[in-house]
Amino acid sequence: MTAEASVETLEAALLARAKRLAEEYLSRAQHSRDRIIEEANERLRLREEREILAAKAMAERVYRRQVQASELKLQGKLDRLRWEWVQAVVQNLSHQCKVLATDKSRYLPVLQRLLAAGAAAIEREELIAEINQQDLGRLQETWKTFAAEAVSDKCVVLSSEPLTCSGGVRVVSKDGRIRVDNTFEGRLERLAEELHQSIMERLFVPPSGLHG
């Protein structure tokens, strides 16, 4: 082989090797490009998923806040309505007590029962009964008989000082240290919470969409 042929053979070999290297580098570059694009697409997909999830979570929070605000608003309206109804019923009951006090035949037996209950609650033998001006006029002359029918085992003296109330009686121990307020107003005040609860249970059913 001549020197010229050897050079050509070497050049051909070098060129072939260069082509193989170029193809290898090109293939690697193509793989790298594909991998970069794939990773970029994956990052983009994950980012989009996170953004979608974040948007959904935000929408859910906004929705829950709107629902809670609506429920609170409705609850407030119901509470006001309930309070108005409770007040109306309590006022009506107070009015009925005042009407009862004007009907002597119905009222005096009730007054005797209130007197008996008040006297029974005080462990004293000598008691004082305080009633309003109207009842003083009715009972001052017949008090001993009236009181004895209600409380047979104790001495209940009628106070000459009228009590400010619509009806009923306040029973006081002789030394003034113990008092049982069985006036209509006193009993209504003590029973207010029980009355409110009873009225709420009778007039209202909790709405199924609300909790708490």
Curated annotation (Swiss-Prot):
GO terms for cellular component: proton-transporting two-sector ATPase complex, catalytic domain. InterPro entries: ATPase_E_C (IPR038495), ATPase_V1_Esu (IPR002842). The keyword Ion transport applies. Keywords: ATP synthesis, Hydrogen ion transport, Ion transport, Transport. GO terms for biological process: proton motive force-driven plasma membrane ATP synthesis. GO terms for molecular function: ATP binding; proton-transporting ATP synthase activity, rotational mechanism; proton-transporting ATPase activity, rotational mechanism. Produces ATP from ADP in the presence of a proton gradient across the membrane. HAMAP family: ATP_synth_E_arch (MF_00311). Belongs to the V-ATPase E subunit family. This is V-type ATP synthase subunit E. It comes from Nitrosococcus oceani (strain ATCC 19707 / BCRC 17464 / JCM 30415 / NCIMB 11848 / C-107). The lineage of its organism: Bacteria, Pseudomonadati, Pseudomonadota, Gammaproteobacteria, Chromatiales.
